[in-house]
Amino acid sequence: MACSWTFLWLLWIAMVAVLLFFLRGPLKISESLESVSATSYFNNLTPKFYVALTGTSSLVSGIILIFEWWYFKNNAGVEQGEDEGSDNEESIDNPKTVPECKVWRNPMALFRAAEYNRFRKETNSEPLTYYDMNLSAQDHQSLFMCDEDQGRAEYEIMQVAWRERESEQRIQTARTALAINSECASALVLLAEEDTETVAQAENVLRRALRAIENTLSTYSNNQIASYGQNGDTVRKRDLTIQTYIKRRLAMCARKQGRLREAIKGFRDLSREQSLSTLLSVQDNLIEACLEVQAYADVQNLLVRYDGYGTSCSYDQREPRSAAMSYTSALLKVRAVAENFRCPSESSVRRGLSSAEQTAIEALTRAMEFNPHVPPYLLEIRAMIMPPEHFLKRGDSEALAYAFFHIQHWKRIDGALQLLSIVWKDFVPKVNKDTHAFSSQLESADKELLPAWHEQSAFPQTESTLGMLIQTFACLAICILAVLSQQVPSSYGEMLRQIVTSGVQMYENSMNTFSQWAPNNIIPYLASKPVSVPEI
């Protein structure tokens, strides 16, 4: 940064020297120095000269002061961290360290055939990336396969089916497995996910898969059931995992078709199985379903259970578990004050706020610190796309996974989005300062999970070097023009007319040159092929 400022000052001096060199004729600098002595020169100066000199120097000083303030505002914390960070690294753990780029499965993932494929047919755009689908294939292999499947033809075929890249090949392979064993639950799950046109059809296939896996589990003896927790029967564990997965997807089908009580009951039953429900993140599905029926007391109890919301222990000293947890807890606090909240949007210092309003603002700020990509989607500043099947915590993918299903809950509460907008306007300048809270690896990893046609959200939004240089040159040009307009108004006006005339001539010459080799219908030709942007 110091090198760039040195370069700018040297550039300033060089521009002034070049300007004086080219204006030595109109300004008659050499004649003035030869014919007029210093004493007579200063005696002949009018008060207008001193007024112009004072104004110009004040302008230059103000510009320098603004640049210095901008520099120290953006780099003071970095320099202080470099000096003092080494003394505290070993003794104090920073609670806001950059998280690892660990990929998490989206518990609210849509059905590929019934939902993702409909979007692809309507927009002719791929909603999922191959990397995202490959991660799903790995998840299915780990959930639905085990080492004891060797020698069982249908399960060996399903191992091949999950690895197939194309959907048609996976479907054909699953049908081959069903031809061998009509009660193969994993094959039915694959067909429900990728070979059904509607959610209702997917639900029917999943119910058939549930009956098949329950028949398989009923064949286990009581001794095997008693020894499962201790000895870890891998085959039974695999079958229980398949059963839990199918029940969760059936509850999601009920939620999508408006049977909310049935969906909540299914999610509650699954949440009692701690190990499997935690593995599949059933609590996120349960929280969203309770929000849909406006059971806010149940949502608060779930947050206390899964994220420590409302407790006075170490909640304020640690990071939230996910964007869904942090923004849901903020929504509950905003709900109590949003309708009667009155705050000027341009004021960053709020006075006379109640404790509930301050708590709501702090909760929103905390949620934005965890994932600042969410508010632009909730406020509909950025275009929404289909959520991916996997996401990265604190990334744009997690923001899409949350906002896609929860934006309706924010709209339902009067004043919630208005309060979110007010806090967001004050938060954007702050998050752009913190260049160390978000890793560049997170942004590049998100690109693998999101489609290429999606404009990815990035924080902090730093200014480009080209923009900074353009702003600097504009300030320098304004200062030079101000000096010339005060010192030599007649010569300055003539020179300005020459510059404008030269610019117009250059524009006309360039347009004539372009029209000589470009076809006459190039504008209609370009306008006839607009870029198609996928719409939801």
Curated annotation (Swiss-Prot):
Question: Which Pfam families does the protein's record reference?
Answer: ST7
Task: Kindly list the residue ranges recorded as spanning the membrane.
Answer: 3-23, 49-69, 464-484
The primary location reported for this protein is membrane
GO cellular component terms, alphabetically, are: membrane
- Record's InterPro entries? ST7 (IPR007311)
Q: Which UniProt keywords apply?
A: Coiled coil, Membrane, Transmembrane, Transmembrane helix
Coiled-coil annotation reads 192-219
Localization, UniProt:
Membrane
How does the UniProt record describe the way this protein sits in the membrane? Multi-pass membrane protein
Q: PANTHER family given for it?
A: PROTEIN ST7 HOMOLOG, SUPPRESSION OF TUMORIGENICITY 7
Q: Which family does it belong to?
A: Belongs to the ST7 family.
Question: Can you say what this protein is called?
Answer: Protein ST7 homolog
This protein's species is: Caenorhabditis briggsae
